[in-house]
Amino acid sequence: MTDTQTQKEAVCTAIDDHRDDIIELAKAVEEEPELGYKEHATTDKVTAAFETMGLEIERDLAITGARASTDLETSADEFTIAVLGELDALVNWEHPKADPETGACHACGHHAQLANLIGTAYGLSSTGILDRLHGTVEFIAVPAEEYLDLEYRRSLVNDGKIEFLGGKQELIKRGYFDHVDCAAMIHADADTPEREILTRSSTNGFIGKFVTYRGRSSHAGAAPEEGVNALNAAMLGMNAVHAQRETFADEENVRVHPILTKGGEGVNVVPADVRMESYTRAKSIQAVNGANDSVNRALESGAMAVGADISIEDYPGYLPFQTDKTMIEIYETNAVDELGSDAIDTHNPHTTGSTDMGDITQIIPGIHPMIGGFEGTPHTPEFQAVDDEMAYIIPAKLTACMIVDLLANSKTKEKIRQQKEQKYSPEDYLTLIREMRRSVTGEYLSD
């Protein structure tokens, strides 16, 4: 038996020894869900687990994030892999575990990500293997992946507390990935109660937008001709967006899905202040930017048609995610050993949702396998873990074993570093997403 195989067996045994602790943490997080940049209690739970392992801990990363390692002063020469877990919940008031005051719930499985994070840390730290690996592992609890509660996040931007609405973007900006060579995390798969893993995938990127149409109020029954109907402007704008859809190439997987968040003040008043939010999604950065230009032009046409004013505030959403082939092949080998080849799906579908793990994979290689053990579709009331072993324990074993294999092989580490060189530098990445932050205005309201 090789030293690497012996280490992996020790890691898996250690994770089994801490099985109850890992599952207890996941369920405690699930019972106390918190929204992005507000995850104080969740971070307390995660860092308390890190403390039991004797790891160095840094808190208050991008407000609520945290990281831990045996040595947080890693040199740039040391090969570093980051294991990530997301802290935040989403809002679904119908979910059975939704917070009655905020609607927050873990209907996207982030509590399972934290189990993977903590479980991997237990496996590598309690065995002492972290100190013997040829490289460094950082465990990072990341805030604010779900792109919601946006008025609160915009207030943080306006107060200078953050620049970006997404947690990983903010951590990149603050330099926490400058020295990291690659990253790994997991995600709950949809409607997969079986012990199966979809290992490879890609996702859309997107730009988020806030739109305000301003018209002129008037009595809707007695004098509508004296008003300028901002709701009509918004409806025309959305219809103009729909007229653009045939121009979007099928292979770019463009998605545009606006909602009205304010339609007026009252039925008997011509709407003068109408608000909209939307995403423009696509498979490539170029397609996101191109489709977004078309969407903004269409939205402005609605204001022009009725003589209303419009303001559009574009914010960088998330960039497209790509699975790293070198890392995922190591992960798959360990997954086959644990679950058998029939349980591993490698067909690499493209999904049209988005994640800020995409931003990470634009600057360093990364993986984001989709884990079984869950019923229901993420973000719905039906979503729940139904197999504790698959949802919380097995992923930690696979992540930890992949790390042991990866750090034991100097050629693999060199290959990953070469792949990192082909990606955006953090500086170029920040330039790219800052260019997505734009304001568009159109003034058509007459005096």
Region spans (language model):
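Metal-dependent amide/peptide-bond hydrolase catalytic core
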Residues: 2-3, 232-447
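Acidic/His- and Gly-rich active-site-bordering loop/insert found
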Residues: 3-107, 111-138, 143-144
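Divalent metal-coordination and catalytic microenvironments
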Residues: 29, 83, 110, 139, ...
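Histidine-centered active-site/metal-ligand motif
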Residues: 30-32, 106, 110-113, 185-187, ...
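Acidic-glycine-rich active-site phosphate/pyrophosphate-binding loop
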Residues: 77, 83-97, 202-214, 369-378
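Structural motif
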Residues: 79-82, 136-138, 181-184, 366-369
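Histidine/acidic-residue-rich, glycine-tolerant segments that coordinate divalent metal ions
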Residues: 92-105, 111, 118, 127-257, ...
